Regions:
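PLP-dependent amino-acid enzyme catalytic core
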Residues: 1-188, 192
Length: 197
């Protein structure tokens, strides 16, 4: 496979603003540096399901990531592509679980102070996991009864404390980081792709 050309400053600016062409997304996926923290996970055959459906079915084992979810890929890629000055001020996110853990472990890896806002209704096991993955660099704030409440509180804190918000979705760098899962499937199974979900 031919290596993608490096992005120019203009390409990167356009990408960061969410106005990128599909080929720029592909370039960002192929050059994402998520493997500083994420694992290259297995693609395991699902033999029983394959027999039942009459097709070859495999499972991408993202449950083998350090936070048991693909969400670490997007969180880390976003933080790796955030200017150092913004990271130095600290980051904040809102999440009920997997993205929160991804930001926490990424903050610990990068030595960044992070505030993680989770709903008060989040399972205690998720809150404990966020604290464990983040260690002393992470502060967990419980706010509201829903993700929407936690998100609103995180936005308020971000504005008041000049923190950089790390979104869980709808961000080009988060999407590209999470897209690295697909690039691994492509490498693992180059000739047998009919449907991916």
């Amino acid at each position: 496979m031919q290596q993608p050309q490096a992005a120019t400053a203009t390409d990167t600016d356009t990408f960061a603003q969410g106005h990128a062409a599909p080929m720029e997304y592909l370039r960002q996926i192929l050059t994402a540096r998520v493997y500083d923290i994420a694992r290259e996970t297995e693609l395991d055959p699902a033999l029983g399901l394959s027999r039942r459906l009459g097709n070859r079915v495999s499972f991408k084992r993202e449950d083998n990531q350090p936070v048991f979810s693909f969400k670490v890929r997007g969180a880390y890629n976003k933080m790796r592509n955030t200017p150092q000055a913004a990271l130095d001020r600290g980051v904040i996110t809102a999440s009920a679980g997997n993205h929160a853990q991804g930001v926490a472990i990424s903050a610990a890896k990068l030595g960044v102070r992070a505030t993680i806002v989770v709903p008060q209704t989040a399972p205690q096991v998720k809150v404990d996991a966020v604290r464990a993955h983040g260690g002393p660099t992470v502060q967990v704030v419980l706010a509201g009864d829903s993700y929407s409440d936690a998100y609103a509180h995180a936005q308020t804190l971000a504005a008041e404390q000049n923190l950089t918000f790390i979104p869980a979705f709808d961000d080009p760098y988060v999407i590209a980081g999470q897209g690295t899962v697909l690039s691994l499937i492509h490498i693992s199974e180059p000739t047998r792709r009919r449907g991916i979900s």
